[in-house]
Swiss-Prot record:
The organism's taxonomic lineage, starting at the top: Eukaryota, Viridiplantae, Streptophyta, Embryophyta, Tracheophyta
Disulfide bond sites: 23-38, 32-44, 37-51, 57-61
Signal peptide: 1-20
Gene Ontology molecular function, alphabetical: chitin binding
Residue ranges the record assigns to the propeptide: 64-79
Originating species: Moringa oleifera (Horseradish tree)
Protein name: Morintide mO1
Thermoactivity: Thermostable. Loses 5% of activity at 100 degrees Celsius after 1 hour incubation.
Domain called Chitin-binding type-1: residue spans: 21-63
Length: 79
């Protein structure tokens, strides 16, 4: 029973942490904390998967293009 309680608590914390990381269009155009990049899927991170404009970065992006995307700028809506 103790293992089940621990597992339940662990999963609850994991879900709360993952939910707290949402950004961009998926989260009301919210920007990431600590100047992290917002990926095309609405998650914060610092690697090229999150920060590259070619990968669909939404804010605090690095490399390529015009504006730097700082301040929670969201990407375009497409055609």
């Amino acid at each position: 029973m103790a293992k089940l309680s621990f597992l339940s608590l662990f999963l609850l914390c994991l879900v709360a942490t993952a939910t707290a990381q949402n950004c961009g269009r998926q989260a009301g155009n919210r920007a990431c904390a600590n100047q992290l990049c917002c990926s095309q899927y609405g998650f914060c991170g610092s690697t090229s998967e999150y920060c590259s404009r070619a990968n669909g970065c939404q804010s605090n992006c690095r490399g390529g293009g015009g504006a730097d995307g700082a301040g929670g700028e969201a990407g375009g809506g497409g055609p």
